[in-house]
Regions:
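Alpha-helix-loop-beta-strand connector modules within alpha/beta enzyme cores
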Residues: 1-18, 37, 42-61, 89-117, ...
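A generic short-segment signal for beta-strand/edge and adjacent turn/coil regions
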Residues: 1-4, 25-26, 78-80
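Catalytic cores of alpha/beta
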Residues: 16-31, 45, 60-72, 104-111, ...
Length: 158
């Protein structure tokens, strides 16, 4: 499946980032990987993947963000901002902590977790680079419309 998805993302010049699985990322020559706190350490992934691949990391605290950056992460996913159905065991991250992380690291920070068009306003003036959204798009009757609405809403508050 990852090979098929990668062919599609390449068609539109969009990087494919594989969540958690460095082996799958390598097998399909994906542009990068995103690593959670319980996945392979960022510094080891960087040694394996090299400097040209994108490595994202999850951070819930400023110390985790600083460590990920020091170990070679290119970007951070911070959250969950709200409860989410995609991660059963997750700890919520406050918007204040999100802002502190943005100020602490010089790499893009993206908010994640339970975000949708009705609650994304909470991220205004946080300095984040973007948002990561799954359920609000995948569970929508019209996923394309849902994605467009979230994109427009985020652009308005950024």
């Amino acid at each position: 499946m990852a090979e098929k998805v990668h062919k599609l993302t390449q068609k539109y010049n969009i990087p494919l980032i594989i969540d958690d699985r460095i082996d799958v990322a390598m097998a399909v020559n994906a542009e990068g990987v995103h690593l959670g706190q319980s996945d392979m350490p960022v510094d080891i992934a960087r040694k394996i993947l090299g400097k040209d691949k994108i490595i994202g990391a999850t951070a819930k605290t400023v110390p985790q963000a600083l460590e990920a950056y020091a170990n070679g992460a290119d970007n951070l996913g911070v959250g969950a901002i709200y409860p989410t159905t995609t991660k059963v065991k997750t700890v919520l991250t406050s918007v204040d902590t999100l802002k502190e992380i943005v100020k602490a690291v010089p790499i893009p920070v993206n908010a994640i977790g339970g975000l949708n068009k009705n609650n994304i306003d909470i991220l205004e003036n946080t300095g984040i680079a973007g948002v990561c959204v799954v359920s609000a798009i995948m569970k929508a009757d019209n996923p394309q419309k849902a994605a467009e609405e979230i994109k427009e809403k985020f652009a308005a508050i950024k």
